[in-house]
Amino acid sequence: MEKTEKIQADMQALGRAARAAARIVAKADTAVKNHALIAMARAIRCHEASLLAANAADVAQARNKGLEPAMIDRLTLTPKGIASMAAGLEQIAALSDPIGAVTDLDYRPSGIQVGRMRVPLGVIAIIYEARPNVTADAAGLCLKAGNAAILRGGSEAIQSNQAIAACVQEGLRSAGLPEHAVQVVETTDRAAVGELITMSEYVDMVVPRGGKGLIERIANEARVPVIKHLDGVCHVYVDLSADLEKAVRVADNAKTQRYGTCNTMETLLVHAGIAERFLPRICKILLEKGVELRGDEAARALVAGIKPAVEEDWYAEYLAPVLSVRIVEDIDQAITHIATYGSQHTDAIVTEDYSRARQFLREVDSSSVMINASTRFADGFEYGLGAEIGISTDKLHARGPVGLEGLTSQKFIVLGDGHIRE
């Protein structure tokens, strides 16, 4: 059998097993799913030594290949990280089970009752890079939402992912659930991804987590729905009526709390009428923290340390201590800038004016829009969703942080008592 044919056959086998397991998991009650999650957490704690050994082998290989220190840092597991993985599974067990929940049940003039029931999606493929903890997180979320999961991690983490998956499958067996409810793609050949994302007969949704190149490839090639976001070009707009103290706190936190996250501010927009009072204050703080500032001519006229911005800077997701700064004439220009250069991820306004706050909420077309709050709040835990599988900037199905409910669908249910349509 040729290599390509073998990969196709292997992926088809994974898909068939996942589809069969999904039918069983979809019927599992909450107690059984929670039993499995707690058992997974226990197995991860019990097998800490073997997890660390598998990860050490991955890290050694990564160093030999000359991978960047940032990638190796994301790849590395520690005892603390393993404990956090286990705790994450226990937190998922503590979340409310969305499956079977009925909403909007109402009588129709015909006498029937019509409502909606929350149901699993089926089989979810998660494709991710570097971070082994995603293996446990994704497995736990998919299971709690009544789905089977096919996990394809980065080749640099293959041994870590296999070791974590073994713990996950131990937990599934403990609860009497099929171990094929969570499977890891064993091959590191990239052709496996191409096969996985086109298996519409077996896979119901794909969730890519990784760099822009990976996500663009999957979005372009997939034949099944994809939950994704390409960039996190997040803005904070400081309005004319902003409270300066609030504006300083929000802008500082949105940029400097963490530089490498998708909900970090990348562009600061400031109303011209408040710029002279606000911009020198916030720029002093940011420059002292080592943030490189790139601004338009008006911003540079107010603050000496700002470098000239070019057109590409307004589109940039830096994921680094770099910030674009622009002075705008009014809220309309700010909203136009966000519509032109933003990524529909998270954008915030700092204002004390109710009507302008409402305008910003209505007109900014992003998955999260905030008033007087840091963009760093765009997170499943912060929104009360519990763990999240990612953030979606798409408009169909899930949008924003994707928690358990985002991994489900709905079906209409109709209740009658011998009713017929006249």
UniProtKB/Swiss-Prot annotation:
Gene3D superfamilies for this protein: Aldehyde Dehydrogenase, Chain A, domain 1 (3.40.605.10), Aldehyde Dehydrogenase, Chain A, domain 2 (3.40.309.10)
Cellular compartment(s): Cytoplasm
Entry annotated with the keyword Disulfide bond: no
GO cellular component term, pick one: cytoplasm
Keywords carried by this UniProt record: Amino-acid biosynthesis, Cytoplasm, NADP, Oxidoreductase, Proline biosynthesis
Principal location listed in the UniProt entry: cytoplasm
Catalytic activity: L-glutamate 5-semialdehyde + phosphate + NADP(+) = L-glutamyl 5-phosphate + NADPH + H(+)
Cross-referenced PROSITE patterns: PROA
The enzyme's E.C. designation: 1.2.1.41
Family per similarity comment: Belongs to the gamma-glutamyl phosphate reductase family.
Function: Catalyzes the NADPH-dependent reduction of L-glutamate 5-phosphate into L-glutamate 5-semialdehyde and phosphate. The product spontaneously undergoes cyclization to form 1-pyrroline-5-carboxylate.
Protein name: Gamma-glutamyl phosphate reductase
UniProt organism field: Nitrosomonas europaea (strain ATCC 19718 / CIP 103999 / KCTC 2705 / NBRC 14298)
Gene it is expressed from: proA
